[in-house]
Amino acid sequence: MAKQEQAPDRANDVFALTSFLYGGNADYIEELYAKYEDDPNSVDPQWRDFFAKLGDNADDVKKNAEGPSWTRKNWPIAANGELVSALDGNWAEVEKHVTDKLKGKAAKGEAKGAAGTPLTAEEITQAARDSVRAIMMIRAYRMRGHLHANLDPLGLAEKPNDYNELEPENYGFTPADYNRKIFIDNVLGLEYATVPEMLDILKRTYCGAIGVEFMHISDPAEKAWIQERIEGPDKKVAFTPEGKKAILSKLIEAEGFEQFIDVKYKGTKRFGLDGGESLIPALEQIVKRGGQMGLKEVVLGMAHRGRLNVLSQVMGKPHRAIFHEFKGGSYTPDDVEGSGDVKYHLGASSDREFDGNKVHLSLTANPSHLEIVNPVVMGKARAKQDLLVGRTRDDMVPLSERAKVLPLLLHGDAAFAGQGVVAECLGLSGLKGHRVAGTLHFIINNQIGFTTNPAFSRSSPYPSDVAKMIEAPIFHVNGDDPEAVVFAAKVATEFRMTFHKPVVIDMFCYRRFGHNEGDEPSFTQPLMYKAIRAHKTTVQLYGEKLIAEGLVTQDDIDRMKADWRQKLEGEFEAGQSYKPNKADWLDGAWAGLRTADNADEQRRGKTAVPVKTLKEIGKKLVEVPKDFHVHRTIQRFLDNRAKMMETGEGIDWATAESLAFGSLAVEGHPIRLSGQDVERGTFSQRHTVLYDQENQNRYIPLNNLQKGQAIYEAINSMLSEEAVLGYEYGYSLSDPRALVLWEAQFGDFANGAQVVFDQFISSGERKWLRMSGLVCLLPHGFEGQGPEHSSARLERYLQLCAEDNMQVANVTTPANYFHILRRQMKRDFRKPLIMMTPKSLLRHKRAISTLAELSGESSFHRLLWDDAQYNKDEGIKLQKDAKIRRVVLCSGKVYYDLYEEREKRGIDDVYLLRVEQLYPFPAKALINELSRFRHAEMVWCQEEPKNMGAWSFIDPYLEWVLAHIDAKHQRVRYAGRPAAASPATGLMSKHLAQLAAFLEDALG
């Protein structure tokens, strides 16, 4: 009796002492409290006693239980019979659900009390409370079990101090309760289970060699799928004997390859996989399981660590080719030009077959700039998905179709946590114009970043935490348990192929040697490297496990190692005389294209379009469906455009662009235009996507030109430069027949993607034999808008120009813009195009063209003559060539400033010559033009400061040209703004004063 009297107090003490009332259970307790305030007899006596002691205001209690006023009515999703509410801690719902089920079972005689009789009401309440406590404990394991998993192969990681949150005592269970069967409604795949049975499944599932983070996912279907896949008495990590031997074989190959290179090329950098060999069988599993689920192609991106191993053991690159490169040989045939790159940056492609499923693998070439290859891989994958489906209209490609191409990214732990482009790519993952049906991220977490410990390289517990923002499931796994790693890879692949979402594998391993093979890691990590030196390799540990299981003998393992070594020796010998027989860069989608020849030739391509075709396209550009409500201002815009097409006069910049896009689409070239606000255009000039003013439906005239045309996509991108530009570059690598454009909101912001310009666009062809026809539209022009809205920093791109690597242009007429865009697709080679695009010229009365200039025999002009030379109705008539006293050369918008100032002053002996394409520099064409004015003074005029713009780049070229024509003045004089630290002034008065000064200098 005394014991009974003591029970409520003891329960209260337990409640008070434990974290049973921690935040996750608060809602449940508040709802119970509200029930108690309505009717004290409706709750369990122990709870009644507990609440009686609190003495809170009844109205407050009820308000708290109702939750905040802004709570969504339909959230959380109701229980579906499998206790989904337990995922979200909706305990009141759980208790009601369990009680109802138990009552039903008692009524049918399925649930019996201790005496074997049907359950009484009191026993049902007790059983329901047991169930709720058990489910709370299960939820704690799902939420926090990963923190207790055995993840670190070295055993150096500190255990979390979590106040025993996973202990059964925390949930009101004592050892006396351990033998009692508790109703858990199939939550762990069991209807009834004792506490030890639950713990056995929970510890194995959540605290073994795999730690799963998935409770941050809000989609119940995704969460339920993961639980269903890994929880239950029959869900152990299990492999057949053949599967285990296959894993051992791959580990021996991975380890043996690294050891072989270490012996043959002592001290040479290879960035070995030593310590992370489980990666290799895991990648095989991803390809194999993906292939079974419909995967056709994998696009890989990875850093240097383990790259050679992936190339040889996963991609199937011949070992002799790698050994040939190690001894300093080229990776391309002798007749292919290129500056080359180090071994651990090179790409490759191959086909692998598993179980009759053929999967194409391609590894993307990348620079040492960590993680910047990620968006490139995603862009490549997106283009391959589009090609696979054969898109012709702006229809959504189903994600199940996109899922046939998998972007697979391998990361280092420090880089994944540290590089901003990682978060940008995760941000792109769900966007309509950039999604790829989920990227699989594999972190090789060797728990160190060069010499920096994780505590100094990230603020979060795991390197993978950034992926939580997109609710990606995360599988942490111990790299010394190859079976667990392969299992995690399998489940991750299945999740991606099922839900078409990104997924992360975080493999804890170690780096057996230094950052590179010439490095001494003990300087900075003495304790870690002491542990590593004493630690057995993954092959040794797994070999011992299989020997203990009786699957193999030590002799078997020794023989496997010897056979592999013998194979490598044979390949090593073959590598001495190996000759690459062919560069693979013009295969597949690139078949029919070639490398470009002499940079100074015209290389115009046939870019003109018949007037009839242009008028047909123009007619469609201004048509909208009958029931479509266009904005009044847009209707005026369309009416003006219709007038231009009718008269063939006054073609403005945006119309020329739409005609270029439309004519290419009709000829079968898809157009992909991406960037911030590109649908409308930063300056409200483009309007290629129209919105119905009453229902916001979209209409895209460029996708309604004719049957069978190619697609036009305008993608308002996320507010990122680096990832989006990298993505579009990647897209251009996979589809040379698509015109891919990226437009900066203002050219000034393009330097947020400087790495992509430096490492890929300007140098990718020379380093890796990879051509790209990407177009970058960078709004540029000094109009008094201040230092961040004036300059795309033209000088930066010109400084990168050499060896015919890309084109840089600053065109001044809509016709030239039309031709340069079409030229990108109308030649049999591809080069990136960096284009300074106008702002004020978009609506300038002089910056117009005629349809005649887009048709007939017209083409792109690298140099443009003075308008006064040909237009008879201009304000001034120029003197004959011999009487011209000065030639002012310029590029871009400043031409119109000079032209109008000259007209205002009535000057007729100064000739204005525009350089429309700055690189490749049109030297021969300029010799022809300037030969007309041998005796004239030569001036270069620009609106940019002297240390910016084209001056430093063009000065030596102009000097060379003047020497060739034997000009009277052998040096060009500079006219423009003086050198400055900031590109432009923010004061309009100062801007106008500077403009007046350099116009006086150029024309005075």
Curated annotation (Swiss-Prot):
Enzyme class: oxidoreductase
Record field: catalytic activity: N(6)-[(R)-lipoyl]-L-lysyl-[protein] + 2-oxoglutarate + H(+) = N(6)-[(R)-S(8)-succinyldihydrolipoyl]-L-lysyl-[protein] + CO2
Cofactor needs: thiamine diphosphate
Enzyme Commission identifier(s): 1.2.4.2
InterPro entries, per the entry: 2-oxogl_dehyd_N, 2oxoglutarate_DH_E1, 2oxoglutarate_DH_E1_bac, DH_E1, KGD_C_sf, ODO-1/KGD_C, THDP-binding, Transketolase-like_Pyr-bd
Signal peptide interval: none
Keyword field: Glycolysis, Oxidoreductase, Thiamine pyrophosphate
An example Gene Ontology biological process: tricarboxylic acid cycle
The keyword Nucleotidyltransferase is assigned to this record: no
Single GO molecular function: thiamine pyrophosphate binding
Pfam families listed in its UniProt record: 2-oxogl_dehyd_N, E1_dh, OxoGdeHyase_C, Transket_pyr
Gene3D superfamilies with a match to the protein in the record: 3.40.50.12470, 3.40.50.970, Multifunctional 2-oxoglutarate metabolism enzyme, C-terminal domain (3.40.50.11610), TPP helical domain (1.10.287.1150)
A single GO cellular-component term on record: oxoglutarate dehydrogenase complex
Disulfide bonds: none
Keyword S-adenosyl-L-methionine carried by entry: no
Family: Belongs to the alpha-ketoglutarate dehydrogenase family.
Record's function text: E1 component of the 2-oxoglutarate dehydrogenase (OGDH) complex which catalyzes the decarboxylation of 2-oxoglutarate, the first step in the conversion of 2-oxoglutarate to succinyl-CoA and CO(2).
HAMAP family associated with the record: SucA_OdhA (MF_01169)
Assembly and oligomerization: Homodimer. Part of the 2-oxoglutarate dehydrogenase (OGDH) complex composed of E1 (2-oxoglutarate dehydrogenase), E2 (dihydrolipoamide succinyltransferase) and E3 (dihydrolipoamide dehydrogenase); the complex contains multiple copies of the three enzymatic components (E1, E2 and E3).
Name recorded for this polypeptide: 2-oxoglutarate dehydrogenase E1 component
Originating species: Brucella suis biovar 1 (strain 1330)
